[in-house]
């Protein structure tokens, strides 16, 4: 099994980074609105804070996922129909990554849980997200800017495993 296959099987997470701007719960509301425009419902914001670490979790799912869940068709659920995110508004205490396009270490404020099999969902979300926050950076194995996502989005049919590929190859 190759490294890429290992990543897909294990269910890697991904993050969004923002430089120099304070993140508030209003940003989370905007993210929820993006998913809603894409036809997703959201759970309530679940406060998963621990001590000084503030974290809110939101689960998103669409009609197809709900139908299959209700009809007990769990083995046919499509990963593109459901995702969980974790929002960290207190950037000062989160660990960061050095982001080459930003030229400094920047903390992540949004994590996507288990992105495996969610290439279509993430590409659509990021295309809409980067229209509102063009300076942010998405990271799984590689860093992706708005320009990278725009190139991918324009290339139909979409590559389902784009998030494991170097954006320099697009």
Where are these regions (language model features)?
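Generic low-complexity, intrinsically disordered sequence content enriched
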Residues: 1, 14, 32, 39, ...
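Short, extreme N-terminal segment that most often corresponds to the first beta-strand
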Residues: 1-53, 169-170
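Acidic, proline/glycine-rich low-complexity IDRs
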Residues: 2-13, 120-170
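Polar/charged alpha-helical tracts
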Residues: 5, 26-37, 64, 68-76, ...
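Ampiphathic alpha-helical segments that act as solvent-exposed interaction surfaces
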Residues: 20-38, 106-139
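Short, intrinsically disordered low-complexity segments
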Residues: 38-111
């Amino acid at each position: 099994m190759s490294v890429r296959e290992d990543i897909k099987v294990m269910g890697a997470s991904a993050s969004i980074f923002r430089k120099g701007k304070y993140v508030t719960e209003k940003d989370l509301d905007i993210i929820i609105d993006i998913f809603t425009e894409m036809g997703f419902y959201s759970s309530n914001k679940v406060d998963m804070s621990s001590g000084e670490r503030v974290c809110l979790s939101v689960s998103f799912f669409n009609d197809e996922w709900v139908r299959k869940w209700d009809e007990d068709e769990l083995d046919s659920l499509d990963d593109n129909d459901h995702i969980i995110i974790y929002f960290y508004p207190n950037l000062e205490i989160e660990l960061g990554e050095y982001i080459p396009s930003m030229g400094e270490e920047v903390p992540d404020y949004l994590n996507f849980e288990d992105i495996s099999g969610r290439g279509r969902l993430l590409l659509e979300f990021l295309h809409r997200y980067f229209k509102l926050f063009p300076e942010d950076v998405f990271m799984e194995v590689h860093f992706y800017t708005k320009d990278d996502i725009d190139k991918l989005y324009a290339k139909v049919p979409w590559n389902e495993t784009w998030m494991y590929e170097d954006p320099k190859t697009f």
